[in-house]
Design a protein with these regions (language model features):
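"…together with the soluble PPM/PP2C metallo-phosphatase catalytic core" -> "…together
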Residues: 2-235
Length: 235
């Protein structure tokens, strides 16, 4: 049953878990030489988007335990699957990515020449994740096509915004608020699985203390896509 208490509880837990996770994951990445120069030339840890995953999992356990409706539980698992998958491919790109190939077109040109770049791998996996989400929520071919594109393009959009500290999170938060207001009650609870982590991490990103990398921007984009297709009649 929807209650404002559940939303508040998930929000508070998400903030606490994220603030606890940031220093630990930051230190882990530093020890693994996951360090990169930011736009000012300062060397900071990259891949801090991983901090979104602990909050997502913990809050998902709570929300799944409190619900017995299969359709609602499926929605939670969709977000879990999409976010963990794209965070996984994101951290691969952050750690192994070839910066000599840029842009979606550049990655696919390399792919057509027989070279699989991490960027192309990310784009392909994003497309298949979008397709998986789409066929889960709809059996209508037109809706499946639209939903797949929404999820895939949302992921790519957040990558494009994540070029300066705080920019991607600002855009994400604005769009998430709009979706939150327009969504049904349970969708709002689902949004609380990830939104608190994003807001709690915002300070570190805005101050350029850490870089969330593709491990984070992918999660922002794909979660936004899941929220859109599950909230606006694409089933």
């Amino acid at each position: 049953m929807y209650t404002y208490l559940m939303v508040i509880m998930l929000f508070c837990i998400g903030v606490v878990v994220t603030l606890t996770s940031v220093p630990m994951i930051s230190k882990m990445l530093e020890k693994s030489d996951m360090i990169r120069a930011n736009y000012k030339g300062d060397m900071i840890p990259v891949g801090l988007g991983l901090v979104f995953i602990p909050t997502l999992i913990i809050n998902s356990v709570i929300l799944i335990y409190s619900n017995i409706v299969p359709e609602k539980i499926i929605m939670i698992y969709m977000l879990l699957f999409a976010s963990i998958s794209m965070s996984f491919v994101g951290i691969i790109d952050d750690s192994l990515g070839n910066r000599g190939v840029t842009g979606l077109l550049g990655h696919f040109k390399a792919l057509f020449k027989g070279t699989l770049t991490t960027g192309a791998f990310k784009a392909l996996l994003g497309g298949f994740v979008g397709l998986t989400i789409a066929v889960t929520i709809s059996k209508s071919i037109p809706n499946i096509i639209v939903a797949t594109l929404v999820v895939a393009l949302s992921t790519n959009m957040m990558n494009l915004f994540d070029l300066r500290p705080g920019r991607a999170i600002k855009v994400y938060t604005l769009l998430a608020i709009i979706i939150f207001i327009a969504s049904a009650k349970f969708q709002r609870e689902v949004m609380m699985l990830i939104l608190p982590a994003v807001l709690a991490y915002f300070y570190f990103d805005l101050r350029a203390l850490t870089m969330m990398g593709d491990a984070g921007s992918n999660v922002l984009g794909v979660s936004l896509g899941v929220f859109i297709v599950s909230s606006f009649g694409l089933a």
